[in-house]
Amino acid sequence: MVLSPADKTNVKAAWDKVGGHAGDYGAEALERMFLSFPTTKTYFPHFSDLSHGSAQVKAHGKKVGDALNNAVGHMDDLPTALSALSDLHAHKLRVDPVNFKLLSHCLLVTLACHHPAEFTPAVHASLDKFLANVSTVLVSKYR
């Protein structure tokens, strides 16, 4: 899905609002995903604690946030920016591709909860397209 110039502007503006909270929002989205889609927990057998506030979930949330910061900064070349992450998830972790869509949805909900005034239909659509592109790149090495 091609991001229009307006989409890119919306994504950058929304992500600017996230600021230094990307890791916190990543952790919150993971917690939301674990609660809403419990089968996703199976990809984290090495985590001893998946509860709210878990240090392991916070650490992984920071990784998610950092990856999204990188993606926002490289919207015009996501395949290159996310290549190593795609390899990791496809070949080592073997995460079911549907889980990227689930996490994307949970991230949208998290952003809407924290920034309701800024989460307009246009921003929602742009973020959804952006996260769909990120998901597509992350599953590209599965083939």
Swiss-Prot record:
The modification Phosphotyrosine is found at residue 25. Coiled coil: none annotated. It comes from the Eukaryota. GO terms for cellular component: blood microparticle; haptoglobin-hemoglobin complex; hemoglobin complex. The modification N6-acetyllysine is found at residue 17. It holds the Pfam family Globin. O2 binds at residue 60. The modification Phosphoserine is found at residues 4, 36, 51, 104, 126, 140. Heme b binds at residue 89. One of its GO terms (molecular function) is oxygen binding. Residues 2-143 form the Globin domain. Red blood cells. Keywords: Acetylation, Heme, Iron, Metal-binding, Oxygen transport, Phosphoprotein, Transport. The modification N6-succinyllysine is found at residues 8, 12, 17, 41. The modification Phosphothreonine is found at residues 9, 110, 136. PROSITE patterns: GLOBIN (PS01033). InterPro entries: Globin, Globin-like_sf, Globin/Proto, Hemoglobin_a-typ, Hemoglobin_oxygen_transport, Hemoglobin_pi. GO terms for biological process: hydrogen peroxide catabolic process. CDD domains: Hb-alpha-like (cd08927). Belongs to the globin family. Involved in oxygen transport from the lung to the various peripheral tissues. PANTHER family: HEMOGLOBIN FAMILY MEMBER, HEMOGLOBIN SUBUNIT ALPHA. Heterotetramer of two alpha chains and two beta chains. This is Hemoglobin subunit alpha. It comes from Pipistrellus abramus (Japanese pipistrelle).
